[in-house]
Each structure stands twice: as structure tokens, then as C-alpha cells.
Amino acid sequence: MTNISNRKDDHIQLALEARHQSQSGSHFDRLTFEHSGLPEQALEDTDIACHFLGRPIAAPFMIGAMTGGCNNGELINQHLAEAAEYCHIPMALGSQRAALEQGLAQNVRRWAPNATILGNLGATQLQQSGLDLAKRAVESVDANALIIHLNPLQ
């Protein structure tokens, strides 16, 4: 396992530890909303389906980029991909850098053959490796689009 994979596994483990969980809560329990229903609109007549990247999706929601390129990330991505497929919503992958550098299989299409999938690379890696890396990222997961994330600390 490489340093990148170890670091990404460490990120997941740190996020799961109790000492990194909020003790104060989110304070959403302090909020109350005034109900302003739409009695003239029946829920069964409401359709939030739309198109994204020219593809039909069930709702204007997307599973955001979470993790990638590490052992613990694969199971997380499997569950997210299965949810994207089941709910007919897009999924953005976490950074593909480690998987591409290590030649690891990226199985997202096995779990979400019909979902709209967005690959993901860092701008720094793209600047260093060029357009070929972007093409490999898209082709390796049969992505419908590619997200370029910015990390100013790199």
C-alpha cells in the first residue's frame, strides 16, 4: 500500500473516531419552521425528475465526492454507487489519483452500471500530468464527466 492509500485510510479512520465527533450537536434542534404547505399541489402530482449532463435523473441531488484510492474507500464507494444506481441520482467519485497511479481497478460501474458518474482529479495532478491523465480518469470508470478539484494547499 502506498503513502497516498495509507493517508486516505487514515482520513476515514479519523472521521470515525469518537473524539472527532461533535459533542455539541449541530443545533438544528433549536430551529423550528413554520409549515407553509401547498394544499393546491398534491404530492403524487409533483415530479422532481430532471436532466443532468443530458441524462435523466430522479431528483436534483448528487452524491458528492467522498473518498477513493484506499482499501477502506472501496466499500464506502460500493455503497454510495449502489445508492446512486437505486435512486437514479448522479455520483461524484473521490479523487482517482491514487487508483490511477497504482493501477488499481475502479469498480464503480459494476455497482452502478446506469448511474451518471463523475470522475475526479486534482488540478495539481492535471497540471503535472496533462490531458492524458484526465482521459485515463474518465475511461477507467466510464465516467460521464470529470470534476477537477482545487486544493490550494497543494
Task: Describe these PLM feature segments.
Residues 76, 104, 129-133:
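Residues at alpha-helix caps and immediate loop-helix transition turns in enzyme cores, especially N-
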Residues 1-53, 57:
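An N-cap/entry alpha-helix motif that binds or orients negatively charged groups
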Residues 81-86, 110-117, 124-154:
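Alpha/beta enzyme core
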Residues 64-65, 92-96, 118-122, 147-149:
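A cross-family glycoside hydrolase active-site/sugar-binding cleft signature
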Residues 19-24, 45-55, 72-77, 81-82, ...:
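Short, compositionally biased "basic patch" segments
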Residues 69-71, 97-100, 124-127, 153-154:
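Short, small-residue-enriched loops and turns at beta-alpha junctions
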Residues 79, 102-110:
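N-terminal active-site wall of soluble small-molecule enzyme domains
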Residues 52-99:
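Active-site cofactor/substrate anionic-group-binding motifs, chiefly glycine-
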